[in-house]
Amino acid sequence: MNEKMGRLTRRTLLGSAAAAVGSMTAAGRAAPAAMPLSRVRSEFLRFDDPADVFKQHFRMERDLVDREGSTLTWYHWTAFVIAEGRAPFPLMRYEGIEYSYFRVVAPLEYRIHAHNLSYVRDLTTGRFATTIENPITGRRVATRSTLLLNDPGTLASPRGFRNLAGDGKQYRQPYRLFRVEDNLVKLDSVRTAPPDWPVTHIENSCQWVDADLFENCTISSLPVHFAGSYVFPFLEWLEMGDAKGHMLGFFDGRKVNRPEDLPREFLERTERDHPELLEPRWGEFERPIKFLF
């Protein structure tokens, strides 16, 4: 920082702001200047080899390791109630993490397990909430943290995903499309749900990263940000009674290098309430698989 910039004070900043407003007012009376052309670059990325598509997807979503690795993502999301006969409305916020961990079990095939932890936050204040009012029933209910610890896991390869709760015969190829937007590479994708989950469940997301990082093949785990949505049933603790409908979540977040890098408030609560979820659950790999691969 040079000496002149170092002498900036609140008074000079306010004075500069006032002068800027005055200049904008004067400029508003003049003929508007023509905006320079700044056309958005938008292209689709195509890969001839399915193996290349899989590798790039794994770099974006997880980590293209040679043996085993893990990926930690952190997110905020807003939960909406979609009840029959009523306009959708936002009910609460969540803050949470997904920790996934994976091992190579065959050439370019990974066994993947994961767990999720999310805490309810007040929709207006953003503070952690122990109770919320359910507008459908008019009752105040106690909130529960959301823990997803029973995902059976998947096998992932260029051929598709095989859920470990199945017989291994069905490969499910996820929807995914890579595209370029200016200096970003984006991945639009739809995740497949375990076979025993509600048939209405679906999750889609968009992940993005700087193009120069994407093109650097030495980076096995790209530092992506992401946003997306998913549909899921009413949570049991909401006590919805006979109401028909479902929930809709909109989320956004990013990869985090390690648990110590999580936001302080979230990290401190998890260290107190669920410290075991701040590390991979490698014991999941000891569970036998029903089929050969």
Predicted segment positions?
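N-terminal secretory signal peptides and thylakoid transit peptides that target proteins
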Residues: 2-21
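General helical structural elements
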Residues: 11-17, 33, 285, 291
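Short hydrophobic alpha-helical membrane-anchoring segments
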Residues: 19-29
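C-terminal segment of N-terminal export signals and the immediately downstream linker at the start
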Residues: 27-59
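Short, solvent-exposed loop/hinge segments that bridge or flank secondary-structure elements
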Residues: 46, 50-107, 130
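Predominantly extracellular/secreted and cell-surface proteins with exposed
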Residues: 85-216
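Extended soluble regions of mature proteins
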Residues: 196-243
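Edge beta-strand at a domain terminus
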Residues: 229-293
